[in-house]
């Protein structure tokens, strides 16, 4: 039974291989389209390889630290040098998923554009297949690596190292990718749209290739690494708590639910079909719904592996209660996605209010957008609170972990739908730059519009899953560190709470400033090219795309280091400093989880709302493109870009990474 998980991971990778071959056999279009696609592909892969080369030093340092700490706590059962093997495996699997997804996404984009010359259904098929490769790579490598590590070592504490490896890569991928894409996006929008008055994806814009590369490094590789981390983190939290609470077969159930989720996602992918002129959103929703229903049925069967009645700690629970806790997580994920859609879609009042406020200038646009983001935290918090209380009543701490597993059981489908968006967006950019028939751009714009909605829902889902996963990992940490309660009368704990509450703000400041510095360089370069290259604005000369790509790449690699180290070093420092220790660290994790979740929701939703308010005006409202309201909305969207694509999403990984660092090094903290 234990081998079923890694075998299912292999099935996912085989399905990804089948989809890759299908995409590669598709027509990549005319020479001009292929030339543009090659530039995007080479820029994306160059960034990814440079990022991975930079991370080698971090991985080697962390590996050495784990080995040293393992020998220092050799007498402690849970801290062993072998944890370093699991850590390296986690980093390699995360890197592998990102590499596979990026390779295929940057090939699917041009083929989607070419397919749109024939039919919208063909374009949807290619774009979703490209997204599905990323989805299957995430769940396939995640479950294969995790399943093998669990089977070989049969020690949940060693398995924790796999989650640490996944988290380490995820944070750098999210931050680095977010800085890259937003530096390019801000430069392309402010100088191209506002100052030069040229449309989006216009080939005269020097930052246009960097902008399209950024869609891939941020929204494909970065997003995939984020959900890869949540996926393995939720499973590992379930395994760790089951082992700590001595639940019979409890370590097996999370792996089985994940395996069932992979099969459900594969079957659901075959239902993403639509007729000509039909709604692509409906097709994606159908595939997601089929996968979710199959996962629910499979989860019920998987929980039958548990005894009908069992004891965890001093409490008695049932297998039916575990099933109910898992479903509570799944429902919470769906609800948070829908709440996110309400606050970020142009179909609803919040975005329309921001568009309306744009009529009186940038200031009122910013004020309305910020207030919308803050207001959007209320319902997700209530949903998470209800899910936590319900899952705890159903199955205790193990129930909270299983709620996170349930929410992430169909990660294969979630990533596929999310990664579909940037592929469709790139296809539209290629169609514009290659000067294809306007009908092609109309089809790709329709697919991209759906992609914007799915991306917003995906961000909400990622944030919700991060909160539950972080809480489950926090529960595993308290069990490993033998902390029975967080005592709010203890000054050390209160100090930890305040430090933890501050960290997401510091992290957001560092990442926002990084985007600002990188965008400044990009804006200066784009302005320079418009002024110094004769005939560029008339379309008679070609801009220096490579220079803008180099600026984004260099800035992203340089600026991702400090925020990444912050998430690892702060919990280690608090846990090791005399007078603070494991209790203060518990307070820090609690404080960071609360404020980090709130910041993530606020920033992601405010940014998404600003973006769609701009698109709402571009659709013809309040004067349409070129109007004063549109200029204000573009400025608001530019502020929102690092909110929704850099700082907000990276906040998810911050709270999970700090918790998993604490969990892995808990034996070391206990011996001080």
Curated annotation (Swiss-Prot):
Requires K(+) for maximal activity. GO terms for cellular component: plasma membrane. Substrate binds at residues 182, 644. It catalyses: Na(+)(in) + diphosphate + H2O = Na(+)(out) + 2 phosphate + H(+). The record marks 455 as: Determinant of potassium dependence. Its main location: membrane. Ca(2+) binds at residues 611, 637, 641. It is an enzyme of class 7 (translocase). The chain crosses the membrane at residues 1-21, 55-75, 82-102, 133-153, 158-178, 227-247, 252-272, 283-303, 317-337, 370-390, 397-417, 461-481, 492-512, 560-580, 584-604, 650-670. One of its GO terms (biological process) is sodium ion transport. It comes from the Bacteria. The record marks 174, 219, 226, 645, 656 as: Important for ion transport. The keyword Transmembrane applies. Its cofactor is Mg(2+). GO terms for molecular function: diphosphate hydrolysis-driven proton transmembrane transporter activity; inorganic diphosphate phosphatase activity; magnesium ion binding; potassium ion binding. Keywords: Calcium, Cell membrane, Ion transport, Magnesium, Membrane, Metal-binding, Potassium, Sodium, Sodium transport, Translocase, Transmembrane, Transmembrane helix, Transport. It is found in: Cell membrane. Pfam families: H_PPase (PF03030). Sodium pump that utilizes the energy of pyrophosphate hydrolysis as the driving force for Na(+) movement across the membrane. Homodimer. HAMAP family: PPase_energized_pump (MF_01129). This is Putative K(+)-stimulated pyrophosphate-energized sodium pump 1. It comes from Moorella thermoacetica (strain ATCC 39073 / JCM 9320).
């Amino acid at each position: 039974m234990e081998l079923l998980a890694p075998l299912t991971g292999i099935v996912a990778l085989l399905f990804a291989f089948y989809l890759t071959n299908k995409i590669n056999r598709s027509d990549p279009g005319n020479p001009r389209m292929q030339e543009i696609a090659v530039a995007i592909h080479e820029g994306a892969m160059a960034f990814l390889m440079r990022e991975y080369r930079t991370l080698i030093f971090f991985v080697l340092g962390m590996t050495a630290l784990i080995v040293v700490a393992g020998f220092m706590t050799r007498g402690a059962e849970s801290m062993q040098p072998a944890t370093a093997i699991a850590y390296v495996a986690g980093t390699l699997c995360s890197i592998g998923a990102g590499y596979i997804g990026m390779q295929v996404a940057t090939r699917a984009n041009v083929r989607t554009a070419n397919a749109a010359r024939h039919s919208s259904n063909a374009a949807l098929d290619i774009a979703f297949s490209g997204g599905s490769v990323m989805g299957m790579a995430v769940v396939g490598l995640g479950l294969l690596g995790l399943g093998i590590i669990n089977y070989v070592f049969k020690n949940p504490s060693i398995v924790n190292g796999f989650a640490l490896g996944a988290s380490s890569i995820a944070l750098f991928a999210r931050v680095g990718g977010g800085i890259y894409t937003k530096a390019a996006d801000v430069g392309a929008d402010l100088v191209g749209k506002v100052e030069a008055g040229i449309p989006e994806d216009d080939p005269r814009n020097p930052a246009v290739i960097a902008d399209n590369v950024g869609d891939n490094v941020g929204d494909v590789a970065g997003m995939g690494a984020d959900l890869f981390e949540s996926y393995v983190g939720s499973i590992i939290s379930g395994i760790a708590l089951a082992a700590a609470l001595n639940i019979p077969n409890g370590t097996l159930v999370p792996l089985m639910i994940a395996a069932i989720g992979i099969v459900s996602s594969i079957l659901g992918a075959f239902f993403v079909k639509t007729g000509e002129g039909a709604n692509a959103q409906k097709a994606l929703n159908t595939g997601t719904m089929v996968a979710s229903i199959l996962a629910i049925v499979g989860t019920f069967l998987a929980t039958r592996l548990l005894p009908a009645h069992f004891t965890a700690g001093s409490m008695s629970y049932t297998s039916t209660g575990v099933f109910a806790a898992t479903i509570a997580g799944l429902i919470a994920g769906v609800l948070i996605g829908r709440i996110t859609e309400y606050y970020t879609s142009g179909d609803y009042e919040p975005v329309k209010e921001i568009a309306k406020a744009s009529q009186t200038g940038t200031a009122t646009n910013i004020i309305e957008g910020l207030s919308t983001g803050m207001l959007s935290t209320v319902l997700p918090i209530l949903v998470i609170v209800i899910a936590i209380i319900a899952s705890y009543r159903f199955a205790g701490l193990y129930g909270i972990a299983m709620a996170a597993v349930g929410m992430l059981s169909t990660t294969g489908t979630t990533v596929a739908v999310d990664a579909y968006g940037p592929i469709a967006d790139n296809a539209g950019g290629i169609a514009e730059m290659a000067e294809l028939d306007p009908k092609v751009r109309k089809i790709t714009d329709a697919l991209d519009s759906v992609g914007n909605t799915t991306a917003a829902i995906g961000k909400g889902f990622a944030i919700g899953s991060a909160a539950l996963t972080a809480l489950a990992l926090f529960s595993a940490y308290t069990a490993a560190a033998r902390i029975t309660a967080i005592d709010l009368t203890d000054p050390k704990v209160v100090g930890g709470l305040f430090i933890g509450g501050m960290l997401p703000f510091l992290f957001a400041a560092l990442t926002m400033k990084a985007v600002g510095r990188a965008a400044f360089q990009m804006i200066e370069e784009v302005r320079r090219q418009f002024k110094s290259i004769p005939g560029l604005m008339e379309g008679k000369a070609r801009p220096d795309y490579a220079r803008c790509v180099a600026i984004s790449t260099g800035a992203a690699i340089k600026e991702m280091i400090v925020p990444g180290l912050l998430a690892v070093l702060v919990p280690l420092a608090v846990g090791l400093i005399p007078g603070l220790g494991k209790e203060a660290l518990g307070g820090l994790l609690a404080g960071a989880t609360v404020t980090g979740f709130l910041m993530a929701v606020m920033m992601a939703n405010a940014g998404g709302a600003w973006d769609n308010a701009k698109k709402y005006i571009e659709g013809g409202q309040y004067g349409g493109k070129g109007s004063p309201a549109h200029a204000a909305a573009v400025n608001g969207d530019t502020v929102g870009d690092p909110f929704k694509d850099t700082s907000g999403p990276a906040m998810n990984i911050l709270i999970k990474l700090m918790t998993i660092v604490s969990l892995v090094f808990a034996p070391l903290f206990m011996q001080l």
